[in-house]
Amino acid sequence: MNKKSVKDIDVKGRVVFCRVDFNVPMKDGKVTDDTRIRAALPTIQYLTEQGAKVLLASHLGRPKGQVSEELRLTPVAARLGELIGKEVKKADEAYGDAVKAQISEMKDGDILVLENVRFYPGEEKNDPELSKAFADLADVYVNDAFGAAHRAHASTAGIAEHLPAVAGFLMEKELEVLGKALSNPERPFTAIIGGAKVKDKIGVIESLLEKVDNLIIGGGLAYTFVKALGHEVGKSLLEEDKIELAKSFMDRAKEKGVNFYMPTDVLVADDFSNDANTKIVPVSEIPSDWEALDIGEETRKTYADVIKNSKLVVWNGPMGVFEIDAFAKGTRAVAEALAEANDTYSVIGGGDSAAAVEKFGLADKMSHISTGGGASLEFMEGKELPGVKALNDK
């Protein structure tokens, strides 16, 4: 990684503004999944052990620049305290005189969680005044929020113009793993691209076609490719305006010598529900009033074989509507193949793919699960992420 890390800077006795991703699911004022809080612990613990005064800043939900009582970070601060085993204080604002007064009472190693940065309209606009107000609180800026690195916001980009800016350990690991996968991959290198829409994955497919040995397509976006081959897709998801693009991707794969895998059979249903009538049909025989909602058995076996013969697999997007058990077998088959492939380094690109491996209880069998859905996607597209660009070079 060519960016400075938290280890490249002396933080003892200094106030550190650390941007983390604590955008966690909540119910009845309690954190229901603390994965993202745990992911930030190594950086937080390191900063406290080094004697920094640690300010933690995060967004939670989408309050749209207004205070929303149920999106305060109070329950998050409480959960962090339990996980870290020490008192964690909470501020009622994210900047200003009251916060400065609290900071003046902090001792080395203390932690103060600032209020939800998205309560301020300037955050998502990357407002220079808000950026400066955040910077005025601290001596050093650490960004450990890879999940928000694709956003040019005040707390992810603007603040870095005013302070020494370095990466936390989570950010560093994400950039190293994803960077190595794209610049110097072990081969055979396989990418699995799923999810609902071709339009969301155009950039990543274009980028990966230049790098991979095998490209596997699944999920709702597959049916635009099926249609491009001249088959009818019934009531399945279809982007009419992307059919020509799908054809061009298949042509480019052929030109580049990339093995392009698409479903050969699919699970179709007469209704979008768990108790729908379902059957597996060849991809060329989808009934006109049925909808394909998962890959079929033959396709599952083919995809599993490709995975097991790969040295590196990057996975972004499910194979079907895995949230409904009846349509989860394809996504589960991919997750299980990755879990069983001992010689394969597996990179799960956040978002739905990460949720799927969690759901199937296979998360601990994956080599790396990215904490950023949108960020990992943009990184794999070859885009420079604003939150990374803003950090100091080594």
From Swiss-Prot:
It catalyses: (2R)-3-phosphoglycerate + ATP = (2R)-3-phospho-glyceroyl phosphate + ADP. Belongs to the phosphoglycerate kinase family. It is an enzyme of class 2 (transferase). PANTHER family: PHOSPHOGLYCERATE KINASE, PHOSPHOGLYCERATE KINASE 1, CHLOROPLASTIC-RELATED. It is found in: Cytoplasm. It comes from Bacillus licheniformis (strain ATCC 14580 / DSM 13 / JCM 2505 / CCUG 7422 / NBRC 12200 / NCIMB 9375 / NCTC 10341 / NRRL NRS-1264 / Gibson 46). Keywords: ATP-binding, Cytoplasm, Glycolysis, Kinase, Nucleotide-binding, Phosphoprotein, Transferase. The modification Phosphoserine is found at S183. This is Phosphoglycerate kinase. GO terms for molecular function: ADP binding; ATP binding; phosphoglycerate kinase activity. It comes from the Bacteria.
